[in-house]
């Protein structure tokens, strides 16, 4: 829709995601920033991939703050990042894994992988940790890792990463799990989005096409270095209280 030019160039992006990420069972290294723990390298990378792809240009500047709010889980639990691109686009990115407000409430209670969530489950993540020893938490983590359970083949909605609003010259676009809402000067249009075959299917398809057919993926090694640079810039900016200027991403 953006590449088609109907709505003009992108002006700004706003995206946020409030989850229970840091209060799910975690391994020791997932609670240490130096080992890639916290929300930035695991979750921020997804969010920064999204805005970089949409903005369509390299990042020039990052100004950010982070939250380390729990001594028992002493790593980045949240961040707020203002990202400027060399083409003039500005993206405001927020992520919180503090396990209180759940932004899926604003996504019709559709979870990140496209399956419906029960709002009555509020507080379950923190509650499950209350009586767990460290060994118990590690055991619980092993039971949740990749391949430990089988997801249904088709989700009723598409995957998402929280509310996402894109402002263009001639319209605002709000991306939801089932549709894209287009807000022009005088009317609103809702464009249905086709379902993918299953959770993570586009990721596995990109990997298969790269290996089997030599198709260049969007998220190449060079691309991922750019996203990693943004993650480190968020930490540096938050620590120093100043913008960080980039040259790779």
Where in the sequence are the language-model features?
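A general structural signal for short secondary-structure boundary/capping elements
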Residues: 6, 30-31, 58-61, 88, ...
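Short coil/turn segments
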Residues: 18, 195-200
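Predominantly a Rossmann-like dinucleotide-binding segment in NAD(P)-dependent oxidoreductases
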Residues: 1-93, 97-114, 241
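C-terminal helix-rich "cap/oligomerization" subdomain common to oxidoreductases
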Residues: 135-138, 142, 147-148, 154-157, ...
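Contiguous C-terminal substrate-recognition/catalytic subdomains in enzyme active sites
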Residues: 97-165
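A generic structural signal for residues located within well-ordered alpha-helices
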Residues: 43-46, 199, 226
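A short local loop/turn or secondary-structure capping micro-motif enriched for an aromatic residue
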Residues: 99-103, 182-185, 199-200
């Amino acid at each position: 829709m953006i590449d088609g030019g109907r709505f003009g160039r992108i002006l700004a992006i706003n995206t946020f995601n409030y989850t229970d990420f840091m209060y799910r069972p975690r391994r020791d290294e997932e609670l240490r920033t130096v080992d890639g723990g916290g929300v930035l390298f695991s979750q921020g990378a997804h969010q920064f991939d999204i805005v970089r792809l949409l903005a369509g240009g390299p990042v020039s500047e990052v100004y950010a703050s982070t939250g380390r709010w729990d001594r028992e889980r002493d790593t980045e639990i949240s961040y707020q990042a203002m990202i400027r691109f060399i083409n003039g686009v500005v993206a405001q990115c927020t992520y919180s894994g503090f396990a209180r407000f759940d932004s899926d409430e604003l996504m019709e209670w559709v979870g990140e992988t496209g399956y419906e969530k029960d709002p009555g489950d509020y507080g379950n993540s923190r509650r499950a940790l209350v009586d767990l020893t460290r060994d118990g938490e590690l055991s619980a983590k092993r039971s949740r890792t990749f391949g430990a359970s089988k997801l249904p083949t088709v989700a009723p909605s598409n995957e998402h990463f929280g509310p996402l609003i894109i402002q263009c010259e001639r319209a605002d676009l709000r991306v939801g799990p089932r549709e894209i809402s287009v807000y022009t000067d005088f009317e609103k249009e809702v464009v249905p989005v086709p379902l993918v075959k299953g959770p993570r299917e586009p990721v596995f398809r990109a990997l298969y096409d790269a290996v089997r057919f030599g198709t260049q993926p969007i998220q190449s090694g060079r691309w991922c270095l750019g996203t990693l640079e943004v993650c480190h810039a968020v930490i540096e900016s938050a620590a120093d209280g100043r913008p960080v200027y980039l040259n790779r991403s």
